């Protein structure tokens, strides 16, 4: 198996490569401007959504306060993004893939305790789930998780050590095998077989999409539902999305980085920025970009887009993120055991 570093070259991104590089370089710097500026440090697949959301919020904020605001974005693997904030990235808000990633920042004192209750729905304004993206016609006839281990399939999925989406991918697969057996040895064997068939392991979800789409590697991409929808929009005749019978409710989280926002004088606008995610306009926009709105009535408006019948485990089924991370993703936990036992070490040519 080959682990790859995150690539900034992405055909399906709305931003040009130059703009992405500019954001990556300036997103965590100082803020000296007459216009209020806040930095949103986010994870890989949200870039298109926030590119659309930011102008919507800027217009709302100008109409409400008479003041202009500029939003700087920074994107990458969720775990790596959290570490960048801990190491000094001047984020005003974080919109990350996992509650656990924000908890890591909280533990440094940068985010106040109780952030999970600061916004509605446990500070999760939109959700997603984990699906399969396959090439048009589904040549390998992949329908469910069993197909990934029973057939000669090359899988693309990112690395849970750096990607929040990859952690959700792992838990989605585990949720499926838990439905089949209570035997922990059988569950682990299933996961080990699945990960032995991962041919490229990128550092982030968008990097894995690039590997699958741009580089034409692998037979199936295990992906966020919203990432699959975005890819099919960009390549309407080339890919199909397969929703497995069992998956997990992936709940990205948002928070104000209180110490930074206080120092930058942006606490008020940062709060407005995250609160606005829960408005009807923003919820519908999230749905347009493939995220499941937390507002149930708006979610039902998009029932033709989202499979609302799939069985979804939640992180609570795993004891919450602290427990799940300790059991599966910490050094020496189950993922490391599986990865360490992968003796194939296959690489794509």
Stretches found by the model and what they are:
Residues 41-43, 134-136, 153-180, 194-198, ...:
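Short beta-strand->loop
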Residues 2-16:
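Bacterial N-terminal signal peptides that target proteins for export
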Residues 23-27:
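C-terminal motif of bacterial Sec signal peptides marking the signal peptidase cleavage site
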Residues 180-245:
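Ligand-binding pocket segment of bilobal, Venus flytrap-like solute-binding proteins
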Residues 137-143, 162, 175-183, 260-268:
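Short helix-loop capping/hinge motifs at secondary-structure junctions, enriched
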Residues 124-131, 191-195, 202-203, 234-267, ...:
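Periplasmic-binding protein-like
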């Amino acid at each position: 198996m080959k682990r790859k570093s995150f690539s900034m070259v992405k055909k399906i991104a709305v931003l040009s490569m130059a703009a992405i590089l500019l954001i990556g370089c300036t997103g965590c710097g100082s803020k000296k401007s007459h216009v209020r500026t806040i930095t949103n440090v986010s994870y890989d697949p949200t870039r298109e959504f926030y590119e659309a959301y930011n102008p919507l919020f800027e217009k709302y904020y100008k109409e409400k306060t008479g003041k202009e605001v500029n939003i700087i974005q920074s994107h990458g693997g969720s775990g790596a993004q959290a570490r960048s904030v801990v190491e000094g990235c001047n984020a005003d808000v974080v919109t990350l893939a996992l509650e656990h990633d924000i908890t890591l920042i909280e533990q440094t004192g940068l985010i106040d305790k109780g952030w999970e209750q600061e916004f509605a729905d446990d500070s999760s304004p939109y959700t997603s789930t984990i699906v399969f993206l396959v090439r048009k016609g589904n040549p390998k006839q992949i329908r469910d998780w069993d197909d990934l281990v029973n057939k000669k399939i090359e899988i693309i999925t990112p690395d849970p050590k750096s990607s929040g989406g990859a952690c959700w991918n792992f838990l989605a697969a585990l949720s499926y095998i838990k439905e089949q057996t209570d035997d922990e040895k059988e569950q682990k064997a299933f996961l080990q077989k699945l990960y032995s068939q991962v041919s490229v392991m990128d550092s982030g979800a968008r990097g894995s999409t690039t590997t699958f789409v741009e580089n034409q590697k692998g037979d199936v991409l295990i992906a966020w539902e919203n990432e699959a929808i975005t890819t099919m929009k960009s390549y309407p005749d080339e890919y199909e999305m397969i929703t497995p019978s069992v998956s997990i409710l992936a709940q990205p989280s948002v928070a104000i980085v209180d110490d930074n926002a206080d120092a930058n004088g942006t606490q008020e606008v940062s709060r407005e920025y995250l609160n606005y995610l829960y408005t009807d306009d923003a919820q519908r926009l999230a749905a347009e970009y493939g995220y499941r709105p937390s507002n149930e009535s708006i979610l039902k408006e998009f029932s033709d887009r989202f499979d609302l019948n799939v069985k979804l485990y939640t992180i609570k089924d795993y004891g919450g993120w602290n427990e799940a991370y300790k059991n599966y993703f910490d050094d020496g936990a189950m993922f490391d055991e599986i990865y360490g036992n992968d003796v194939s070490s296959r690489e794509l040519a």
